[in-house]
Amino acid sequence: MNIAVVGLSHKTAPVEIREKLSIPEPQTESAIAQLTSYPHIDEVAILSTCNRLEIYIVAGETDHGIREVTQFLSEHSKLPVHSLRQHLFVLLHEDAVMHIMRVAAGLDSLVLGEGQILAQVKNTHKLGQQYNGIKTILNRLFKQALTAGKRVRTETSIGTGAVSISSAAVELAQIKAENLAACRVTILGAGKMSRLLVQHLVSKGATQISIVNRSRERAQELAKQFSEHPIRTHLLPEMMTVIAESHLVFTSTSATEPILDRAKLEMVLAPNQPLMLFDISVPRNVHTDVNELVNVQAFNVDDLKAVVAQNYESRRKMAQEAERLLEEEIEAFDIWWRSLETVSTISSLRSKIETIREQELEKALSRLGSEFGDKHQEVIEALTRGIVNKILHDPMVQLRAQQDVEARRRCMQTLQMLFNLDVGEQFS
């Protein structure tokens, strides 16, 4: 068995490609069911965020498993495989392990060191277990990655003052608008990203904020978290009326299709009315055709790179101490993985010797006859078990402790050959 990850991110694909491959949470169950139905995929976990879509698998035949994931992504995105391949990356075992550790720690994020990704990895683990995609190997891997991410947050300085996608969007808005306090700001959506938007907007001096959401209760709940600020809440049917009165609009909803386009804006905006749209959703909430309107500017997550780059160098130095810490967690996983490789050989050897012990004990007891008491049988039973355990102890300890991968595999192959063991599918 091998671990592999097939995916794409802000580093390999623009937002117009990423949004086609995005797997919203309500689709996770069916996606996992489809992936695990393929013959070569034993375990699967799906990490889908605004900046990445990564599918982690455990496969007996890695090449076949990767092909099956690629085919799934092609069908899901309706992009031909040859177009998709130029945006995909594939990482195998050690590299895949290193990658999920770096992702959980925020070291692979657009915003280096951002903390929201850790919660997203945790949710991936939870959903993978809930929908029977994650079993022994990915369960251990994701637990180790979550431990790594938590340690990086608590034991290094990279999380101190870390920016996020939301804060970078507000930073960009401040650069473009110059005076946030004078702007009427509307936020579409009331989730975690929207909460962070409000947090950063009020810290930058914004005083005229409206939240538009499908559920009034959710919008009011968010507004109450900032009760010292006069935040207005509106339902979705009021969206265009509210936008018509706004200078800045931030979109952060789970909609899978654009909720704003040129036609909708043309109906409510005055001729040449200025409006700036900051879309931090993937799939995008704002259609690209809005840029055809005079004085309307639309920005998406890919436009945040310039803002993020400003503090990248200082955070890169902090990341170096985090990388050293990750090495410890990777080693811990590798030790567990090495011990797992030996399980089937050890189990098969113990099972074979136990079968021989039981057969020979039964022959001996039958020869001794019925006058041989139960107490004597128990003594002989314990004696034979003790002999078996003593004989197996040292080989098993040495096999588990062997650090050299090739040497350990040679030992296992030798045991399998000498004892004619049938161990089934081995880890590789």
Swiss-Prot record:
Active site as annotated: C50 (nucleophile)
Binding site for NADP(+): G189, A190, G191, K192, M193, S194
UniProt-annotated site: Important for activity, residues: H99
CDD domains: NAD_bind_Glutamyl_tRNA_reduct (cd05213)
UniProt-listed Enzyme Commission number(s): 1.2.1.70
Domain notes: Possesses an unusual extended V-shaped dimeric structure with each monomer consisting of three distinct domains arranged along a curved 'spinal' alpha-helix. The N-terminal catalytic domain specifically recognizes the glutamate moiety of the substrate. The second domain is the NADPH-binding domain, and the third C-terminal domain is responsible for dimerization.
Quaternary structure, from the entry: Homodimer.
Miscellaneous comment in the UniProt entry for this protein: During catalysis, the active site Cys acts as a nucleophile attacking the alpha-carbonyl group of tRNA-bound glutamate with the formation of a thioester intermediate between enzyme and glutamate, and the concomitant release of tRNA(Glu). The thioester intermediate is finally reduced by direct hydride transfer from NADPH, to form the product GSA.
Name the record gives this protein: Glutamyl-tRNA reductase
